[in-house]
């Protein structure tokens, strides 16, 4: 299967995405969280101002214009969407979910979504929604036979030579990076990455090694972070791990270290337990984790060789800070770059729109 100058190959535990030579751009979108107030289950669920601004005819203004802006800026090879894509409680018909999928399919760019804690709340059959995404041309999604909805790997590969360069043996492929796409739960189950999910990750990496000869560095993408983000912030000296109400703006109210950046304006505590996953992740070359869930947190902090990043919230649905809307660009450097540049960089792309701008 080919899409947007990329080739998608499906494996047992995930996908292999062939990307061109040069730097590779991954765009993270998170907490788009489309709300259709016309589908409120009870008349008092939203206040009147929310009901009026979140009707079905305003989805472009509240969400998709921000997605288009981000895609136009980043020109990504891959889009990852880290949960709370459509607020299921406000989409019992499934109409907004299908529109969401159709919009991203129409971009012609491979996109890899995970579930957040609100996606599962629809009265629609979630398994059918998973099957719907699995059948889409550009969507890299796999339900996975473990706890949750959507547990799989995406491995970025590129030709290590042009056809015919390898003594007539044809094109060889080398892996650049494997992304572990995981359901962090929080709706049907308590948050946290489970033992069986770690087992699936282990099998996925075996498949990567079998097909490419090695396991590349890892990213992890999921919705709800646990205590690992608090510990990273403490290690960097920005807060005490147990100070769940800490607020700061790195480089503004506290000095930045190691290229860190972003703002913490949402309380975050210990929800779930990802300690076993973190042990596995680090032992297998993991060095970047990308999450969402906390709409007013945008910190990106390096700790113990891993960069912990809250993606910038995309769009205007649900609570947010108007000056913290946009997307997050992850750039993998060209392996041919011998300048000593970091293996990857992370940058928030802030929107140029005002919430009051006309659609």
Residue ranges and their predicted role:
Residues 1-95:
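N-terminal active-site segment of His-dependent metallophosphoesterases
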Residues 2-8, 12-16, 20, 153-158, ...:
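Binuclear metal-dependent phosphoesterase catalytic core
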Residues 2-18, 96-216, 328-329:
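Extended active-site neighborhood of metal-dependent phosphoesterases/phosphodiesterases
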Residues 23-36, 176-185, 221, 307-313:
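Active-site-proximal beta-strand elements of phosphoester/diester hydrolases
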Residues 31, 67, 79, 84, ...:
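Divalent metal-coordination and catalytic microenvironments
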Residues 33-38, 87-90, 113-125, 187-189, ...:
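Active-site environment of divalent metal-dependent phosphoester hydrolases
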Residues 38-42, 124-127, 230-235, 322, ...:
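Short aromatic-enriched loop/helix-cap "lid" or pocket-rim segments at secondary-structure transitions
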Residues 74-77, 172-174, 178-180, 189-294, ...:
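His/acidic metal-ligating clusters that form di-metal
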């Amino acid at each position: 299967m080919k899409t947007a100058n990329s080739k998608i190959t499906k494996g047992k535990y995930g996908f292999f995405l062939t990307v061109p030579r040069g730097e590779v751009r991954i765009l993270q979108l998170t907490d788009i969280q489309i709300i259709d107030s016309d589908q409120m289950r009870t008349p008092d669920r939203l206040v009147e101002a929310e009901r009026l601004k979140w009707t079905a005819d305003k989805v472009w203004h509240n969400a998709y214009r921000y997605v288009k802006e981000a895609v136009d800026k980043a020109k990504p090879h891959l889009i990852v969407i880290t949960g709370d894509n459509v607020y299921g409680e406000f989409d019992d018909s499934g109409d907004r979910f299908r529109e969401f999928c159709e919009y991203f399919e129409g971009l012609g760019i491979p996109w890899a979504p995970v579930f957040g804690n609100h996606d599962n709340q629809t009265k629609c059959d979630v398994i059918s929604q998973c099957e719907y995404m699995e059948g889409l041309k550009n969507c890299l999604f796999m339900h996975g036979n473990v706890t949750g909805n959507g547990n799989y790997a995406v491995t970025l590969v590129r030709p290590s030579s042009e056809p015919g360069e390898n003594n007539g043996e044809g094109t060889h492929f080398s892996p650049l990076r494997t992304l572990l796409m995981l359901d962090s739960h929080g709706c049907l189950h308590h948050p946290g990455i489970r033992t069986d999910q770690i087992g699936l990750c282990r099998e996925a990496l075996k498949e990567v090694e079998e097909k490419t000869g090695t396991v590349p560095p890892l990213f992890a993408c999921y919705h709800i972070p646990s205590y690992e983000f608090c510990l990273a912030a403490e290690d960097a000296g920005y807060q005490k791990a147990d100070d769940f109400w800490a607020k700061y703006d790195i480089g503004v109210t506290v000095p930045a270290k190691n290229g860190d950046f972003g703002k913490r304006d949402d309380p975050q505590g210990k929800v779930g337990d990802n300690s076993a996953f973190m042990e596995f992740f680090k032992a297998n070359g993991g060095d970047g984790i990308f999450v969402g869930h906390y709409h007013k947190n945008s910190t990106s902090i390096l700790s113990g060789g891993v960069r912990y990043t809250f993606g910038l919230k995309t769009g205007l649905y649900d609570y947010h800070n108007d000056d913290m809307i946009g997307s997050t660009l992850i750039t993998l450097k060209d392996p041919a770059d011998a300048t000593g540049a970091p293996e990857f960089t992370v940058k928030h792309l802030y929107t140029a729109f005002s919430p009051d701008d006309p659609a």
